[in-house]
Structure formats: structure tokens, C-alpha cells
A protein has these predicted regions:
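Extreme N-terminal starter segment of soluble prokaryotic enzymes
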Residues: 1-5
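Structural motif
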Residues: 7-11
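Glycine-rich phosphate- or other oxyanion-binding loops that anchor nucleotides, phosphorylated ligands
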Residues: 12-191
């Protein structure tokens, strides 16, 4: 596990310096994440595996927890009016509505949670699938699936996806960085 690529939306979410591998900052949202990761892979080649780190909201997981996500869905994909299942992208061969990387080796946490990704910062959770919500992971997982690269996401639960979510998110950024460094990077000898 010597050649990872760590992918984050924002420098504010990661901010760990002195690493001997690449960290890619994609910007916020599914489109930015997919474009930036694909561009990186085409220019720099394949890393051994890709680790997404970032913050997430959850009603199911306690704020302040670091969790791993190995299953990913698009929470804002809804073409049910045309007879498709909710969260399923129409006319895609071989990709189910849920992308599953549960077989990722050397996972230090093994919660194997589902991350529901969409292009909105959630301040209320209602009717969404998944254990946690974010804005990039599904897109990153889909690129990894297409390029046949192992993928895992670690999410620091920064907020409860409620009316205080934006305040909680800012206050919890540094706590998440420290926990990710200790729980994942140091365990994998990547720091």
C-alpha cells in the first residue's frame, strides 16, 4: 500500500502536509470530482489505490466519528417518473444503482457504510438512502470503477445534516483531519 492517491474536495478538509504521495483537491460536487480525478488519471497514470477523505453529514452516525464508506449511491438521481428505480442512472450497462467496493483490502475501520452523494449540502435528511451524505464520493467511486482502481472513502461526520450543519461543519474540520491522520494514515504508514 505504497502508492495511494488521496482525493479531497477542499484543502480546508485535509490540510496535512509533508506527505510523499499525491493529494488531489477536486473542488465541490460530483462534476468537479469526476473531471478532476479523470484528468489526473489521464495525465499522471494509475495509483495503486484511491482514498477519498472528507466530511459528511449523518443522522445515523454520531458527530465526531470517522467512518469508512465502501458503497456509494447518487442520492439526487431520480428518473422514477420514467419507470426507473430511484438512485439508478438509466441505460447504464453493468452498473447497479449502488457501487460497491467492500472488498477493499486492509481497511482499518470496516464499518462498510453506504454514502449517498448529491449536489446539495444537506440541512435536513428526509427520504434519502445511505448512512452518510456527501457531495463527491459517488462520482469518485464511479471513475475508479471505470478505471478498475481500488477505492475507499473515509468520512469524518462533521454534522447531523440539520439546521446547524453549516456551523458544525466549519468547527469540525481540524478535528476530522487529526482523526484521519491517526486512524488511517499512521496505521497504513503513510505519514
Amino acid at each position: 500500500m505504497n502508492n495511494p492517491l488521496v482525493v479531497c474536495a477542499l484543502k480546508d478538509e485535509f490540510g496535512i502536509k509533508g506527505l510523499n504521495y499525491d493529494v488531489l483537491y477536486t473542488g465541490v460536487g460530483k462534476v468537479n470530482a469526476a473531471i478532476q480525478l479523470t484528468e489526473y488519471l489521464l495525465k499522471k497514470g494509475r495509483p495503486e489505490y484511491i482514498v477519498n477523505y472528507g466530511t459528511a453529514g449523518s443522522k445515523k452516525v454520531k458527530v465526531g466519528s470517522l467512518v469508512d464508506c465502501t458503497k456509494f449511491v447518487q442520492r439526487d438521481m431520480d428518473v422514477s417518473g420514467l419507470g426507473f428505480k430511484k438512485y439508478e442512472t438509466p441505460f447504464e450497462d453493468g452498473i447497479s444503482k449502488k457501487i460497491d467496493f467492500s472488498a477493499f483490502e486492509n481497511n482499518p475501520l470496516n464499518h462498510l457504510l453506504t454514502c449517498a452523494t448529491g449536489d446539495s449540502f444537506i440541512t435536513t435528511i428526509g427520504g434519502h438512502v445511505g448512512d452518510v451524505v456527501d457531495m463527491e464520493s459517488y462520482a469518485l467511486a464511479k471513475v475508479c470503477l471505470k478505471f478498475d482502481i481500488s477505492f475507499i472513502a473515509f468520512k469524518y461526520i462533521s454534522d447531523s445534516a440539520d439546521e446547524d450543519a453549516s456551523i458544525d461543519w466549519v468547527e469540525n474540520l481540524k478535528k476530522g483531519q487529526k482523526l484521519f491522520k491517526k486512524t488511517v494514515l499512521e496505521v497504513w504508514n503513510l505519514f
